[in-house]
């Protein structure tokens, strides 16, 4: 039997707060391995622009590259449409052995959000929670809400005792855009990836675009992702962003420019007999 923990997140970017949580969970003695789930299209973030899924997956992968007990999953990224936690858990359960245990790891804010999720009763009946207190919430407040969930759902909730590292993804992105020192914010491998691809270089202008454009591009990315290796995929995303930047500057169709940039190499990694 393997004791798995599931830690999900947008990871935009993966930062030292995520890394600290992972290390605390592994050091708790309660977990053998961690599944790091990179978020797909989240139901509560449809009006928020996030970086392309493949960028976020690669940042997470590099952020834990030295931790053998951690595996990064793209299960949600590969799924079309919105990703609900219950659907992810159902799919993940099919990949685990019947005698494996799965614990869900969250920040304490989830204790207040969970009742509004899809099928919270099913989630809490099947899976125990391991909670890290953070976000300015006191342990007393978190424990009071945990007691309410125990009473309403018979939830199994345990708290991590070690202090967390409080970091804001927005703060980290702004630091990277300004090319300021980031050693205390993100792992070195992640910083190198961000710098090499200038991942947040056009954020000021691209964030202002209609989120519907990003949803369309995200769907194209999901479809093209299986056909490209990592190097070619990241290159295509870089071209997509630069094409959109130029389209905005010259008042051209931003969506068309983005699609053209993303798909310009879509057959580059295919065998000749497949293309023909």
Report the location of each language-model feature.
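Nucleotidyltransferase catalytic core that binds NTPs
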Residues: 1-215
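Acidic/His-rich, divalent-metal-binding segments that scaffold phosphate/diphosphate chemistry
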Residues: 202-276
């Amino acid at each position: 039997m393997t004791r798995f923990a599931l830690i999900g997140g947008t990871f935009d970017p993966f930062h030292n707060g995520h890394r600290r949580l992972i290390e605390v969970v592994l050091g708790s003695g309660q977990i053998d391995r961690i599944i790091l789930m990179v978020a797909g299209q989240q139901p509560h973030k449809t009006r928020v622009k996030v970086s392309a899924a493949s960028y976020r997956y690669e940042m997470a992968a590099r952020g834990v590259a030295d931790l053998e007990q951690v595996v990064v999953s793209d299960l949600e990224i590969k799924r079309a449409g919105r990703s609900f936690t219950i659907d992810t858990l159902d799919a993940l359960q099919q990949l685990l052995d019947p005698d494996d245990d799965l614990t869900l790891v969250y920040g304490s804010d989830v204790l207040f959000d969970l009742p509004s999720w899809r099928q919270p009763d099913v989630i809490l009946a099947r899976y125990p929670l391991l909670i890290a207190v953070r976000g300015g919430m006191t342990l007393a407040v978190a424990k009071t809400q945990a007691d309410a969930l125990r009473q309403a759902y018979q939830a199994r909730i345990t708290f991590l005792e070690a202090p967390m590292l409080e970091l804001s993804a927005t703060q980290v992105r702004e630091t990277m855009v300004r090319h300021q020192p980031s050693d205390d914010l993100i792992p070195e491998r992640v910083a190198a990836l961000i710098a090499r691809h200038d991942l947040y270089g056009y954020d000021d202008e691209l964030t202002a675009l209609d989120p519907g454009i990003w949803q369309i591009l995200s769907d194209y990315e999901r479809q093209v992702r299986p056909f490209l290796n990592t190097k070619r995929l990241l290159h295509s995303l870089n071209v997509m962003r630069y094409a959109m930047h130029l389209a905005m500057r010259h008042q051209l169709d931003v969506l068309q420019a983005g699609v053209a940039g993303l798909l310009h190499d879509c057959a580059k990694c295919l065998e000749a007999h497949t293309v023909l």
